[in-house]
């Protein structure tokens, strides 16, 4: 184990997702049993004492791969030299808050973090945004980090992707490992479009295996799109462990690559593919290799799918307009 440690920053590190995420990172879930990890943990001042308690627990695990932990509230210090930044912390929507209020509150956070990453992160940095509204938070951070290539920013739609795989597996009786080429299009919101028309179940077209358009429209899509709300209703708190697991999955596949016979969903900056307006951070089917992603090309988009994609990307365009008017980008 002679490899130099990967410096990984996690924001909102004392939060619920952070609590699930840090122990997975430290145990080797990201890059396997041979690559040490150095954790750089960012929190707001009032949460630093709680974060110290989490670090005590990390110490008590005696993880062989955890080479060091640094905590603080200054992104300029915490992001210094990091090669992977997982931006988990975000202002949750409170009672009486409009979506514009949420965008404004998070805008200040992601503006500051984008500028700090631009100033001090490693040249090879990759930035994954989990904190919601993730797509537009990623857009704000990206815009405020002009020296970092735009393709180094991604927002998390892997949780939606994993949810879609799970629902399709349950419907068809297949193992989750039998399902390939699932796609999430658009925003990480209730307008997202989980698309199984290109997916495969044990090598066969998923839509043909299901053979039930009503189930696709009335059950599959809304169940995936509204799963977060269903978990809040059941658990009394938002999904945290599953979001952390998806954050690991997304970062691992980004850094290590996707299998030859599969793709994943990532929200990345649009180049105009599939009619998604250029510059929006929207979810696409992508393959990854060597730390770089490529949008899967040449997929046929039928009229039903077109309408769903357009609805979600219109929401993203509205969010972009809102943060532009707020002077955040």
From Swiss-Prot:
Q: Which Pfam families match?
A: Ldh_1_C (PF02866), Ldh_1_N (PF00056)
Active-site residues? Answer: 188
Please give the biological process terms from Gene Ontology that the record holds.
Answer: carbohydrate metabolic process; malate metabolic process; NADH metabolic process; oxaloacetate metabolic process; tricarboxylic acid cycle
GO-annotated molecular function: L-malate dehydrogenase (NAD+) activity
A Gene Ontology CC term for this entry? peptidoglycan-based cell wall
Q: Which reaction equations make up its catalytic activity?
A: (S)-malate + NAD(+) = oxaloacetate + NADH + H(+)
Residue positions annotated to bind substrate are: 93, 99, 132, 163
Q: What keywords tag this UniProt record?
A: NAD, Oxidoreductase, Tricarboxylic acid cycle
Q: What does this protein do?
A: Catalyzes the reversible oxidation of malate to oxaloacetate.
NCBIfam families under this entry? MalateDH-SF1, PRK05442.1
Xref: HAMAP family: Malate_dehydrog_2
Protein known as? Malate dehydrogenase
Q: Which gene encodes it?
A: mdh
